[in-house]
Amino acid sequence: MYRYKISVEYLGTNLAGWQRQSGVMSVQQILEEAIYKFSGEQVTLFGSGRTDAGVHAIGQIAHFDLSKYFEPYKIIRAINYFTRPYIVGVCNCELVDNNFHARFSAIARHYVYRILNRPYPSVIDFDRVWWISVPLDVSAMQKSSLYLLGKHNFTSFRASSCQSKSPIKTLTKLDIIKENEEIKLYFSAPSFLHHMVRNIVGSLVLVGKNIWQAEQMQQVLEVADRKAAGPTAPACGLYFIKADY
């Protein structure tokens, strides 16, 4: 068997997320069907992260096995041909060792969340950013984010449907950068809880609106109660950037 590692980008607006689900269109299903159309083989695609409905990806990593060898550049061309008309595409493909696993071999995952902070929305990016019309205090958000760095119990930022065995995670990076009218929040960790990034963003926005003091984030983290944290930020602003191996 030949194992292929692919890098995938997609707009998740009209998709049900990464994972294959009955009755709806997912990124996994689109790619698996495209692979079948050019190879004649039914494969199971394994991704480095399971993005939710509406979440986008710049460099989602996945792998699959084929019994027949194909040149990687031909796989890129074939998948991109058969994924049309969906906005899902393969950017890179390489042959890897059979011990490689897109999910379990990953040592870090990286996300960015985009906030458009201006009085009027974007026609072009309306489903690719979270538009917030009131000015946000970025310096307060940056100060508050420091309480979240490191190894903590992130129960307060965990979805009720999360299947992770432990709420303990290590957030290695949380950078908040203002670029003109956009605020970008960069997250890195070995792994994340379900909705963890979006729940943190929703809480930081409360700080940015001066509804919360920056120091309140520490209390929310320590109480380990989802009800104590802010709302879940919309899926449209979240992007899976890449995974490290």
Swiss-Prot record:
Disulphide-bonded residues: none
The task this protein performs is described as:
Formation of pseudouridine at positions 38, 39 and 40 in the anticodon stem and loop of transfer RNAs.
Gene Ontology process terms (BP): tRNA pseudouridine synthesis
> What protein does this entry describe?
tRNA pseudouridine synthase A
Q: Where is the signal peptide?
A: none
The Enzyme Commission number assigned here is: 5.4.99.12
Keyword tRNA processing included in the entry's annotation = yes
Q: Assembly state and interactors?
A: Homodimer.
Q: Which Gene3D superfamilies match?
A: Pseudouridine synthase I, catalytic domain, C-terminal subdomain (3.30.70.660), Pseudouridine synthase I, catalytic domain, N-terminal subdomain (3.30.70.580)
User: Where does this protein hold substrate?
Assistant: 111
Instruction: Extract the GO molecular function terms from the UniProt entry.
Output: RNA binding; tRNA pseudouridine(38-40) synthase activity
Which keywords has UniProt assigned to this entry? Isomerase, tRNA processing
Q: Which residues form the active site?
A: 52 (nucleophile)
Quickly give the catalysed reaction: uridine(38/39/40) in tRNA = pseudouridine(38/39/40) in tRNA
Q: Which organism is it from?
A: Rickettsia bellii (strain OSU 85-389)
**Family per similarity comment:** Belongs to the tRNA pseudouridine synthase TruA family.
Entry keyword annotation includes Protein biosynthesis:
no
